[in-house]
């Protein structure tokens, strides 16, 4: 099974279970930056250009309220790439104050 297909199959479960453990909302984006695992169903399928930036740069980034002011449905927090076989296949984000 292709890595990206695998991510699509587990994204929602990973987002839900991780959120329960850490106490913060979690989102997972596919390799094109679309949310495929989210705690708020209204956000499913949203394009998250910040996650796409994380995927392109292959590094963890942090977003402040100022960074997301013009991005409806996107929230401040931290996001890291999901890398398999040296390829960024998506990103996982944790919603909250970047300083936390």
Give residue spans per PLM region.
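Alpha-helical/coil-rich non-catalytic "connector" segments in signaling and regulatory proteins
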Residues: 1-100
């Amino acid at each position: 099974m292709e890595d990206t297909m695998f991510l699509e199959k587990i994204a929602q479960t990973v987002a839900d279970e991780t959120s329960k453990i850490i106490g913060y909302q979690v989102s997972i984006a596919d390799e094109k930056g679309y949310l495929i695992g989210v705690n708020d169903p209204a956000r499913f399928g949203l394009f998250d250009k910040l996650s796409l930036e994380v995927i392109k740069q292959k590094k963890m980034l942090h977003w402040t309220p100022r960074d997301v002011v013009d991005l409806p449905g996107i929230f401040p927090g931290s996001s890291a790439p999901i890398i398999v076989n040296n390829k960024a296949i998506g990103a996982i984000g944790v919603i909250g104050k970047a300083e936390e």
